[in-house]
A protein has these predicted regions:
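Hydrophobic membrane-insertion alpha-helices, especially the h-region
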Residues: 14-32
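Conserved SGNH/GDSL esterase-like catalytic core that processes O-acyl groups on lipids
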Residues: 108-184, 190
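Catalytic His-Asp segment of secreted/periplasmic serine-dependent ester chemistry enzymes
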Residues: 275-278, 283-351
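Generic structural signal for small/hydrophobic residues in well-ordered secondary structure
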Residues: 30, 104, 159, 259, ...
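Short, amphipathic alpha-helical "lid/cap" segments that border enzyme active or binding sites
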Residues: 139, 143, 245, 249, ...
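Membrane/wall-proximal cationic-aromatic binding patches
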Residues: 37-131, 144, 232-235, 310-314, ...
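Serine-dependent acyl-ester chemistry module
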Residues: 166-293, 306-312, 316
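N-terminal Lys/Arg-rich, disordered targeting/topogenic segments
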Residues: 1-10
Length: 351
């Protein structure tokens, strides 16, 4: 009995010693990376928050932040104005004939400088002020962003809504339903990874090394530690394949709600899903893409779809970052020219 107690005691003591040594080692490594590899310092990185009214915004206001991807895709500056939006313009200013842009991370300009976004390049092409109020979110978030901008003095008469075909389409009536256990696990993992990215230089360094090494990256993807960003599989990450009709109807309905609520005839900019060109659901993605646009046209929405231009050269993924998947500067430049040409071609004087 005495021997068993002593054995348990020794195991416990050894465990505590190993734990203390591990924590101390991690602490030293964190200090080392912070001191000698400042490019991995997470301080000042882009962060988001939802305000008391449910509006998604940049967390820090009136300052520039850094948006960095551990895959090496980008390292850019993001300025947040006094309202928590990525725009140097003051929306309270009475800009004549201003066009507002709302959308998710593509329209926000993830991975590119503010001046490289399609909205900012469009301003130079059509010689009209463009005010971008985009934040990574969905139709519900776009609705709240438009309302937030109006409450803060914006006069929105002309609007472009960037619709991301990868994650904007959903059954909005069921947005708070679903598998709570599965959702909790996914959200918990995402929360932990996000927090580590925000506070740990060591985590940023390690993930960068993993992404940069072909073997380590493959192992990490196979066990699910990192996402397979370069081959986005629409069917595996949404319920679209199982409830396509319901999802598309609900998505079109929400866009109609926005149009009627704010008395605006928006241009709908389609952000094509990468599943059109990658993964195992190319045919399904093609069907969804065409069906959704057809439904929008039936409801008399103005549509701009850059898909054909992306595919024209045969290498549509050249307009996206290699790993992150968002549009790169080349993609934004192409989209800005497409929008400008469509505005001129269709004689959209309002725009």
């Amino acid at each position: 009995m005495q021997n068993n107690f002593q054995l348990i005691k020794n195991i416990f003591i050894n465990f505590i010693l190993i734990l203390i040594a591990s924590v101390f080692s991690i602490f030293l490594l964190e200090l080392f990376v912070n001191s000698f590899l400042p490019q991995f310092d997470p301080r000042g990185m882009v962060a988001y928050q939802v305000n008391d009214e449910g509006v998604p915004l940049l967390k820090y206001k009136n300052q520039s932040m850094r948006q960095w991807k551990n895959t090496g895709d980008y390292d850019v500056s993001v300025f947040s104005n006094e309202l928590g939006l990525r725009n140097h313009k003051d929306i309270k200013t009475n800009y004549i004939d201003a066009i507002y842009v709302v959308g998710d991370s593509y329209s926000f300009g993830q991975g590119v400088e503010e001046s490289e976004r399609y909205s900012d390049q469009l301003e130079g092409l059509i010689k009209k002020p463009i005010i971008n109020i985009s934040i990574p979110t969905d139709f519900q978030g776009y609705d709240r962003l438009i309302n937030y901008a109006i409450k803060n003095g914006a006069n929105i008469e002309e609007l472009i809504i960037g619709v991301c075909m990868e994650n904007d389409l959903r059954v909005y009536e069921d947005i708070n339903k679903g598998d709570k256990k599965d959702s909790f696990i996914r959200e918990s993992i995402h929360f932990i990874k996000t927090k580590l990215t925000e506070i740990s230089a060591l985590y940023c360094f390690v993930t960068s090394v993993v992404h940069g090494n072909r073997i380590l990256s493959k192992v990490a993807k196979n066990i699910g530690i990192i996402s397979k960003n370069e081959a986005y599989d629409l069917a595996s990450s949404s319920a679209l394949m199982n409830s396509k009709k319901k999802t598309l109807l609900s998505s079109v309905k929400y866009l109609k709600i926005i149009r009627e609520k704010y008395k605006i005839e928006p241009i709908i900019l389609i952000v094509p899903s990468r599943s059109l060109w990658l993964g195992n659901n190319i045919n399904q993605a093609d069907e969804i893409h065409k069906t959704f646009i057809s439904m929008l046209l039936t409801e008399n929405f103005l549509i701009i779809d850059p898909r054909e231009s992306f595919e024209k050269g045969g290498t549509p993924m050249d307009y996206h970052f290699k790993y992150d998947g968002h549009w790169n500067a080349k993609g934004h430049q192409l989209v800005s020219s497409i929008i400008a040409n469509q505005i001129v071609k269709n004689n959209l004087k309002k725009f």
